[in-house]
UniProtKB/Swiss-Prot annotation:
Its EC number is 2.6.1.83. Signal peptide: none annotated. This is LL-diaminopimelate aminotransferase. It comes from Prochlorococcus marinus (strain NATL1A). Pathway: Amino-acid biosynthesis; L-lysine biosynthesis via DAP pathway; LL-2,6-diaminopimelate from (S)-tetrahydrodipicolinate (aminotransferase route): step 1/1. Pyridoxal 5'-phosphate binds at residues 72, 108-109, 132, 187, 218, 246-248, 257, 291. NCBIfam families: DAPAT_plant (TIGR03542). Substrate binds at residues 15, 42, 109, 132, 187, 291, 387. It comes from the Bacteria.
Length: 408
């Protein structure tokens, strides 16, 4: 009989969002007339920006001609897209990131998982808690952890708590870690990292020869001009960080699939006594395992940076952030303790009356027909919290707030 990857069997339970779907399905089967409002999974709802749609339509027509047809593209992404990303997202902010250091992909979720392909299993790993489940689960699946304890913490991983008690600030560890996952603006808490905090992290990483995996998927939602949008705004980060970005939330590409990862050519790692550059390893990995993002989609992503695209993206981001403000203001006025939802599209809510995260999930589902995300699904430190997403229509967000406020 064929042998399986037994590390998958160590996963504590079903992935968070499939478990949510299971509970919704069970509830809906018993309550077929319930009008559910979903503020759980962070999927966008508004149409693709016009500039992106028009660019993709033109690309489709181009592909219908002999001269314009394209087959396999470069695994790293087309040069014209990488150059415009470099100019707009990095050079404009004083970051020395070249087009060659940008790898276009079909999602930051994939990249933050696949990056483990080029990193050794012996690395000591730290994650924030609560945390985007993919960081933890992919380490489990690739044999980098032991078993989980009763609250879902795995041996082999170290957890850095971020909560209301510490102002949602990820404290610099006293111990040495080789690999550190940071996500700011943070999913799920909505917290941000100041420049001073990121300077401290870069200093720590350089002193300990650590690698920071920095997820900046929500950078477009930052309103505070003092908050960095990229780890590479910090001096020295080129030597200790990889950054993941995505078009999913700012441009509505969750169903279109386009993202990118930045790996500076100066970034080094160890293979025994030999020093190797991570850029070359990732380039080799992508060339072997990835055929690139479609030409049509990359033209759509390119349009994000056009004059019209920038206006439309700004409007789209503002729409979701207005939703976030509606959630935060309504729930705060109703007596809930609400964090985030200022520089990120997520509201992180303290559950009332010491309810558990899943009990509050079931309570809102049954009493208000509103779906959110239990904080405990993001880690032990998320217990007693609940995440609501701003990704929905204005009508649904306002209606959901009316329902929840009535319960209070």
């Amino acid at each position: 009989m064929v042998k399986v990857n037994a590390d998958y069997l160590k996963l504590k339970a079903g992935y968070l969002f499939p478990e949510i779907s299971r509970r919704i399905t069970e509830f809906s089967s018993k309550n077929p007339n319930a009008n559910l409002i979903r503020l759980g999974i962070g999927d966008v709802t508004e149409p693709l920006p016009l500039a992106c749609r028009e660019a993709m339509k033109a690309a489709i027509e181009e592909m219908g001609t002999e001269d314009g047809f394209r087959g396999y593209g470069p695994e790293q992404g087309y040069k014209w897209l990488r150059e415009i990303i470099s100019e707009n997202d990095y050079i404009s902010r004083g970051c020395e990131i070249s087009a060659e250091e940008i790898f276009v992909s079909d999602g930051s979720k994939c990249d933050s998982s696949n990056i483990l392909d080029i990193l050794g299993k012996e690395n000591k790993i730290a994650v924030t808690d609560p945390v985007y489940p993919v960081y933890v689960d992919t380490n489990v699946m690739t044999g980098r952890t032991g078993e989980a304890n009763s609250v879902g913490e795995y041996t082999g991983l170290s957890y850095i708590p971020i909560n209301s008690e510490n102002g949602f600030e990820a404290s610099i560890p006293k111990d040495k870690f080789d690999l550190i996952y940071l996500c700011f603006p943070n999913n799920p808490t909505g917290a941000v990292a100041t420049k001073e905090q990121l300077v401290s992290w870069v200093k720590y990483a350089k002193e300990n020869n650590s690698l920071i995996l920095f997820d900046a998927a929500y950078e477009a939602f930052i309103k505070d001009e003092s908050i960095p949008h990229s780890i590479f705004e910090i001096e020295g980060a080129r030597d200790c960080a990889i950054e993941f970005r995505s078009f999913s939330k700012n441009a509505g590409f969750t169903g279109t699939r386009c993202a990118f990862t930045v790996i500076p050519k100066s970034l080094k790692g160890k293979a025994g006594i030999e020093t190797v550059d991570l850029w070359s390893l990732w380039n080799r990995r992508q060339s072997t395992k990835f055929n690139g993002v479609s030409y049509v989609v990359q033209r759509g992503a390119e349009a994000v940076y056009s004059k019209e695209g920038k206006i439309q993206i700004k409007k789209l981001v503002s729409f979701y952030m207005d939703n976030a403000e509606i959630i935060k203001s309504n729930l705060t006025a109703a007596g809930f303790e609400v964090f985030g939802a200022v520089n990120a599209p997520y509201a992180w809510i303290k559950t009332p009356k010491n309810m558990s995260s899943w009990d509050f999930f079931d309570f809102l589902l049954e009493k208000a027909n509103v779906v959110g995300t239990p904080g405990s699904g993001f880690g032990a430190a998320g217990e007693g919290y609940f995440r609501l997403s701003a990704f929905n229509s204005r009508e649904n967000v306002e209606k959901a707030m009316e329902r929840i406020v009535k319960l209070k």
